[in-house]
Amino acid sequence: MKARVLIVDDSALARRNLRQILESANCEVDEAEDGLAALERYFLERPDVVLLDLVMRGMYGLDVLEKLRQLDPLAKVVVVSADVQTSSQQLVDQAGAKAFITKPFDREEIIGTLKAVLGGTS
C-alpha cells in the first residue's frame, strides 16, 4: 500500500508504533504531536489520510477533526483512540471521520482500515 499518512498523537510511543506499522506497509509517514502542528503539517504535506488521536494536550482531537473538515471537506481522517465511549465515537462519526480504531490496535487493523478508507489503494 503506497499512501502518505500523517500521524497526530501527543504520545511519542504511539507515533513510533504507528510509524513502524505504516512504514512496513510502504507508506510515507509524517508526524505531529499536537493539533496545531497537525493542521500546519496537513496543509504543507497534503497526506492521503490522517491518523488522529482524540485526547491530546492543547487542542482536542475532535476540534482538529472539525477544523480539518471545515478547511478541506475531502480530508480523510481515521481516529485512533483509547476513548471507547459510544458518545465519543458518535461525535467523531458526526464530525466526518472515516473510521474509528480503538487503542490498543494491531497491524492488521491499521492496514485494513487504511485500505478501506483509501479505496483499496495499493
Question: Where are these predicted regions, by residue range?
Answer:
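Residue-level signal for the "D+5" position in two-component response regulator receiver
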Residues: 31, 58-59, 94
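Active-site beta3 strand of CheY-like receiver
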Residues: 45-51
